[in-house]
From Swiss-Prot:
Residues 108-162 bind DNA. This is Protein BEARSKIN1. It comes from Arabidopsis thaliana. The NAC domain includes a DNA-binding domain and a dimerization domain. The gene is BRN1. GO terms for biological process: plant-type secondary cell wall biogenesis; positive regulation of DNA-templated transcription; positive regulation of gene expression; root cap development. Its main location: nucleus. InterPro entries: NAC-dom, NAC_dom_sf. GO terms for molecular function: DNA-binding transcription factor activity; sequence-specific DNA binding. Residues 8-156 form the NAC domain. PANTHER family: PROTEIN CUP-SHAPED COTYLEDON 2-RELATED, PROTEIN SOMBRERO-LIKE ISOFORM X2.
Amino acid sequence: MSSSNGGVPPGFRFHPTDEELLHYYLKKKISYEKFEMEVIKEVDLNKIEPWDLQDRCKIGSTPQNEWYFFSHKDRKYPTGSRTNRATHSGFWKATGRDKCIRNSYKKIGMRKTLVFYKGRAPHGQKTDWIMHEYRIEDTEDDPCEDGWVVCRVFKKKNLFKVGNDVGSNISNNRLEARSFIRRESPYQGISMFELNKPEEISVHQYPQPPMFQPHHKPLSIGYDYSLALLPRESEYQQACQPSGVEVGTCKAVSEWGIVNCNMVSHEDSSRAMRFEDDGNNTSSTVQPPSNLLSLRGENGFLGLF
């Protein structure tokens, strides 16, 4: 297999996890162990630009969005601990806090996030190139630690611009729909309550209640109750039509009708009571219908009530 494709078979795709990069690849690198397949190359970070890594760190023939390499940490000062990450065109700047990488048992390393800036520090132009730098957890009694790190470089997807384009299209559609409603709707500026409310009632007009008609059917047990209610039927309908109430007073202009007590059962629906108000006295008299009293006496004898 030629070295142009990284020595991997066709269709090979390299997507290691953080734990695999630290526990397998970087640990073997600092221990000088041999890899069965050389897929991660050594790169001098100070001598290569991020856009040149696409050709230098290519693995196989399949398209890649991430590029991996080993790099030896270069001290910015001989006696200091700061790492030099400057290139010819710019520099890598650390951002945020380092993330601790753990396996199922313990802490195995750290991950540092860096962003590439064009120009010279402290003034530089931020780019979309991001790098994750992995290092083994520093220990004083580890003789194999040789300053090696493994890096993953990728270009940040510009989802924000795409989202803005989509959002702008949606907002434009909403604005067009709103303008169409303003042009076409005859109910602009009218609330839902005003659209659905009934016609306004004047001060001196009282709403007429609907005609109350008895909906129950008389019990067919040998006695026809409709004959007994015939004399009261016309009087029942007339009583349910008030002629009006004077505004500002509590006096009824005319006589109100019969209070229908059909809330309990069918056998009580035929019972009624009549209230009369002479317009001057505040007390009302109750007159039970004579026909119903006679019916109650007969039905009581039959055991119906």
